[in-house]
Amino acid sequence: SFRDVIAACASKEDTRGNWIDDEIFESYCALHQAGHAHSVEVWDEDRLVGGLYGVTLRGAFFGESMFHRVKDTSKVALCFLVDRLCDGGYQLLDLQWVTPHLRQFGAVDISRARYLTQLAESMQLDCRFDGPRSLRGGPVREPNRSGGRDSAPGSSSSGAPSARCAPSSRS
Protein backbone atom coordinates (compact mmCIF):
# COMPACT_ATOMS: atom_id res chain seq x y z
CA SER A 1 0.00 0.00 0.00
CA PHE A 2 0.98 3.63 -0.33
CA ARG A 3 1.61 3.93 3.43
CA ASP A 4 3.86 0.86 3.32
CA VAL A 5 5.98 2.37 0.54
CA ILE A 6 6.50 5.63 2.43
CA ALA A 7 7.27 3.73 5.64
CA ALA A 8 9.88 1.67 3.78
CA CYS A 9 11.41 4.82 2.27
CA ALA A 10 11.49 6.48 5.71
CA SER A 11 13.20 3.53 7.35
CA LYS A 12 16.00 3.09 4.83
CA GLU A 13 19.27 2.16 6.49
CA ASP A 14 21.09 5.07 4.90
CA THR A 15 20.30 8.64 5.90
CA ARG A 16 18.50 9.67 2.70
CA GLY A 17 15.13 8.50 4.08
CA ASN A 18 15.51 10.29 7.40
CA TRP A 19 13.80 13.44 6.16
CA ILE A 20 10.44 11.63 6.25
CA ASP A 21 9.27 12.40 9.78
CA ASP A 22 5.74 11.79 11.12
CA GLU A 23 4.39 15.14 9.90
CA ILE A 24 5.75 14.64 6.38
CA PHE A 25 4.54 11.03 6.36
CA GLU A 26 0.97 12.07 7.23
CA SER A 27 1.08 14.97 4.75
CA TYR A 28 1.94 12.64 1.88
CA CYS A 29 -0.79 10.23 3.01
CA ALA A 30 -3.26 13.13 2.90
CA LEU A 31 -2.07 13.98 -0.62
CA HIS A 32 -2.61 10.33 -1.54
CA GLN A 33 -6.15 10.42 -0.11
CA ALA A 34 -6.82 13.51 -2.23
CA GLY A 35 -5.56 11.74 -5.38
CA HIS A 36 -2.30 13.68 -5.78
CA ALA A 37 0.34 11.29 -4.39
CA HIS A 38 0.90 7.84 -5.84
CA SER A 39 3.11 4.82 -5.34
CA VAL A 40 4.53 2.15 -7.57
CA GLU A 41 5.01 -1.09 -5.68
CA VAL A 42 7.02 -4.20 -6.50
CA TRP A 43 5.72 -7.36 -4.89
CA ASP A 44 7.10 -10.87 -4.61
CA GLU A 45 4.00 -12.90 -3.81
CA ASP A 46 2.60 -11.04 -0.77
CA ARG A 47 5.86 -9.29 0.23
CA LEU A 48 6.55 -5.67 -0.73
CA VAL A 49 10.14 -5.76 -2.01
CA GLY A 50 10.57 -2.39 -3.68
CA GLY A 51 8.83 0.77 -4.69
CA LEU A 52 8.70 4.50 -5.04
CA TYR A 53 6.27 7.33 -4.51
CA GLY A 54 5.70 10.84 -5.74
CA VAL A 55 3.22 13.61 -6.37
CA THR A 56 1.42 14.42 -9.60
CA LEU A 57 0.36 17.85 -10.74
CA ARG A 58 -1.27 18.10 -14.15
CA GLY A 59 1.38 16.77 -16.61
CA ALA A 60 4.23 16.40 -14.12
CA PHE A 61 5.27 13.69 -11.68
CA PHE A 62 7.58 14.70 -8.84
CA GLY A 63 9.44 11.66 -7.56
CA GLU A 64 10.06 11.82 -3.83
CA SER A 65 11.77 8.62 -2.70
CA MET A 66 12.33 4.97 -3.55
CA PHE A 67 13.49 1.85 -1.75
CA HIS A 68 14.38 -1.77 -2.37
CA ARG A 69 14.53 -4.85 -0.18
CA VAL A 70 15.55 -7.08 -3.07
CA LYS A 71 18.26 -6.04 -5.53
CA ASP A 72 17.00 -4.09 -8.55
CA THR A 73 13.36 -3.87 -7.48
CA SER A 74 13.49 -0.06 -7.26
CA LYS A 75 14.69 -0.16 -10.89
CA VAL A 76 11.65 -2.26 -11.80
CA ALA A 77 9.44 0.34 -10.09
CA LEU A 78 11.13 3.20 -11.94
CA CYS A 79 10.78 1.51 -15.33
CA PHE A 80 7.12 0.79 -14.63
CA LEU A 81 6.59 4.41 -13.57
CA VAL A 82 8.18 5.79 -16.75
CA ASP A 83 6.00 3.52 -18.87
CA ARG A 84 2.91 4.59 -16.95
CA LEU A 85 3.75 8.27 -17.30
CA CYS A 86 4.42 7.94 -21.03
CA ASP A 87 1.09 6.14 -21.50
CA GLY A 88 -0.65 8.90 -19.54
CA GLY A 89 0.82 11.76 -21.59
CA TYR A 90 2.96 13.20 -18.79
CA GLN A 91 5.69 15.57 -19.97
CA LEU A 92 7.91 15.92 -16.90
CA LEU A 93 9.35 13.43 -14.43
CA ASP A 94 11.21 15.42 -11.77
CA LEU A 95 13.73 13.13 -10.07
CA GLN A 96 15.18 15.91 -7.85
CA TRP A 97 18.79 14.98 -8.61
CA VAL A 98 20.48 12.68 -11.07
CA THR A 99 22.44 9.83 -9.54
CA PRO A 100 24.45 7.19 -11.41
CA HIS A 101 21.56 4.82 -10.60
CA LEU A 102 19.08 7.11 -12.39
CA ARG A 103 21.47 8.10 -15.18
CA GLN A 104 21.58 4.48 -16.41
CA PHE A 105 17.88 4.86 -17.28
CA GLY A 106 18.40 8.03 -19.29
CA ALA A 107 17.95 10.65 -16.57
CA VAL A 108 19.76 13.87 -17.37
CA ASP A 109 20.45 17.15 -15.62
CA ILE A 110 18.77 20.12 -17.26
CA SER A 111 19.22 23.83 -16.76
CA ARG A 112 16.88 25.81 -14.55
CA ALA A 113 15.54 27.65 -17.60
CA ARG A 114 14.77 24.40 -19.43
CA TYR A 115 13.18 22.94 -16.29
CA LEU A 116 10.91 25.96 -15.88
CA THR A 117 9.91 25.75 -19.55
CA GLN A 118 9.11 22.04 -19.27
CA LEU A 119 7.25 22.62 -16.01
CA ALA A 120 5.15 25.39 -17.58
CA GLU A 121 4.37 23.16 -20.56
CA SER A 122 3.39 20.27 -18.31
CA MET A 123 1.01 22.54 -16.38
CA GLN A 124 -0.98 23.02 -19.60
CA LEU A 125 -1.86 19.31 -19.61
CA ASP A 126 -4.56 17.46 -17.71
CA CYS A 127 -3.05 14.03 -17.08
CA ARG A 128 -4.48 11.43 -14.73
CA PHE A 129 -2.65 8.77 -12.75
CA ASP A 130 -5.85 6.81 -12.30
CA GLY A 131 -6.61 3.38 -11.01
CA PRO A 132 -4.42 0.44 -10.20
CA ARG A 133 -2.44 -1.20 -12.96
CA SER A 134 -0.21 -4.18 -12.67
CA LEU A 135 2.44 -5.96 -14.64
CA ARG A 136 3.29 -9.56 -14.03
CA GLY A 137 6.29 -11.07 -15.66
CA GLY A 138 8.68 -13.93 -15.49
CA PRO A 139 11.56 -14.09 -13.07
CA VAL A 140 14.06 -11.26 -12.97
CA ARG A 141 17.24 -12.80 -14.32
CA GLU A 142 20.86 -11.82 -13.94
CA PRO A 143 23.49 -12.70 -16.54
CA ASN A 144 25.94 -15.43 -15.61
CA ARG A 145 29.63 -15.15 -16.46
CA SER A 146 29.20 -16.80 -19.84
CA GLY A 147 26.63 -14.16 -20.82
CA GLY A 148 23.59 -16.41 -20.42
CA ARG A 149 20.84 -15.89 -17.90
CA ASP A 150 20.50 -18.36 -15.11
CA SER A 151 19.62 -16.90 -11.72
CA ALA A 152 16.52 -15.19 -10.45
CA PRO A 153 17.30 -13.14 -7.33
CA GLY A 154 14.26 -12.22 -5.33
CA SER A 155 11.83 -14.12 -7.47
CA SER A 156 9.16 -16.15 -5.79
CA SER A 157 8.54 -19.85 -6.13
CA SER A 158 6.22 -18.93 -8.99
CA GLY A 159 9.07 -16.91 -10.49
CA ALA A 160 6.85 -13.89 -11.09
CA PRO A 161 7.73 -10.67 -9.28
CA SER A 162 5.17 -8.04 -10.11
CA ALA A 163 4.94 -4.26 -10.17
CA ARG A 164 1.83 -2.23 -9.72
CA CYS A 165 0.67 1.30 -9.19
CA ALA A 166 -1.49 1.76 -6.15
CA PRO A 167 -4.71 3.70 -6.65
CA SER A 168 -5.38 6.76 -4.58
CA SER A 169 -8.49 6.70 -2.46
CA ARG A 170 -10.11 9.02 -4.99
CA SER A 171 -9.66 6.64 -7.93
Question: Where do the language-model regions lie?
Answer:
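N-acyltransferase acceptor-side catalytic subdomain
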Residues: 1-171
